[in-house]
From Swiss-Prot:
E.C. number: 6.3.5.-
Pfam families linked to this entry: GatC
Function (record text): Allows the formation of correctly charged Asn-tRNA(Asn) or Gln-tRNA(Gln) through the transamidation of misacylated Asp-tRNA(Asn) or Glu-tRNA(Gln) in organisms which lack either or both of asparaginyl-tRNA or glutaminyl-tRNA synthetases. The reaction takes place in the presence of glutamine and ATP through an activated phospho-Asp-tRNA(Asn) or phospho-Glu-tRNA(Gln).
Family: Belongs to the GatC family.
Species for this entry: Pseudomonas syringae pv. tomato (strain ATCC BAA-871 / DC3000)
GO BP terms, alphabetized: glutaminyl-tRNAGln biosynthesis via transamidation; regulation of translational fidelity; translation
Record protein name field: Aspartyl/glutamyl-tRNA(Asn/Gln) amidotransferase subunit C
Enzyme class: ligase
Single GO MF annotation: ATP binding
Domain of life: Bacteria
Subunit text: Heterotrimer of A, B and C subunits.
Catalytic activity entry: L-glutamyl-tRNA(Gln) + L-glutamine + ATP + H2O = L-glutaminyl-tRNA(Gln) + L-glutamate + ADP + phosphate + H(+); L-aspartyl-tRNA(Asn) + L-glutamine + ATP + H2O = L-asparaginyl-tRNA(Asn) + L-glutamate + ADP + phosphate + 2 H(+)
Length: 95
């Protein structure tokens, strides 16, 4: 699947990227190259191959899950600009 100029323009718009006309051909080529690599990887037969979570068979030593600090929620919320029902109120950032 090859991307066309209109596809790249739409992707740039959705990603809120400001691409100028000079950048679009280079970006189209780069994205098509990435998609070509994805196509190559999808074509590989992985039947019988167990998924790999980590290349090393090492495990981490885990500490006991215990509270190590006191709850300072009230202290932090006292200096917050806006709090309601124990939650921080922030400006809306998504339209």
């Amino acid at each position: 699947m090859a991307l066309e100029r209109s596809d790249v323009e739409k992707i740039a718009h959705l990603a809120r990227l400001g691409l100028n006309d000079a950048d679009i051909p280079r970006t189209t080529e780069a994205l098509n190259s990435i998609l070509g690599l994805v196509d190559q990887m999808q074509a590989v037969d992985t039947t019988g191959i167990e998924p790999l979570a980590h290349p090393l068979e090492a495990t981490q030593r885990l500490r006991e899950d215990a509270v190590t600090e006191r709850n300072r929620r009230d202290t932090y919320q006292a200096i917050a600009p806006a709090v309601q029902d124990g939650l921080y109120l922030v400006p809306k950032v998504i339209e």
